Amino acid sequence: LRAIANDNLIVQVSLDGGRPEDHDAYRGPGTWEKTVEGIKILQESGFRVRLGTTETPANSAHLEKLCEFHRSIGILDEDHFIRPLAKRGYSKEGIELGMGNLVPEITVNLDGIFWHPLSTDADMQVSKNFLPLAPAVERVKTQLEAMYQTGGVPLMTFT
């Protein structure tokens, strides 16, 4: 990992609580400790770490504790994002998401490129290939322009 660490590469990690019980309620028993250990390894390897937090009924009353925790391990407030629980994937609760209510935040994972990190399901996949990135960015721009012109979300197939 140290060989690829640099100022232009930020690794985002999901952390939903400053305490195991807040994070593990949705992520599974024992995942908080593994996640925090992974964050420390990334930091020691020279990576800038960004946290993505999903606000859930289990952690919503304890988000300030999470902020205190991430500051204590050297993660700045500007590198912490809190998003609402999305009714996507296996989640039976949360808000319904789609292109109409999500500002694009291009997300790359091993499955390809997606419109937003809250929506990495097939219907929000921009490209199955994560390289090169430029064609996917152009597709998102085209979709945004169409949404602006029509005032809605036209049916588009990205993949």
What residues fall within each predicted segment?
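Short catalytic/ligand-binding loop motif for oxyanion handling, primarily in non-cytosolic enzymes
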Residues: 20-22, 58-61, 115
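Short, well-ordered secondary-structure micro-motifs
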Residues: 23-24, 62-63, 92-93
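Short, electropositive alpha-helical surface patch
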Residues: 61-82
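Accessory C-terminal segments flanking Radical SAM cores
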Residues: 85-159
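Radical SAM/AdoMet-radical enzyme domain recognition
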Residues: 1-55
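Short low-complexity, flexible loop/linker segments enriched in glycine and/or proline
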Residues: 1-3, 65-67, 94-95
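Hydrophobic, Leu/Ile/Phe/Ala-enriched alpha-helical segments that form helix-helix packing faces
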Residues: 39, 70-74, 115
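Active-site beta-loop-alpha junctions enriched in small/polar residues
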Residues: 14-18, 54-56, 83-88, 120
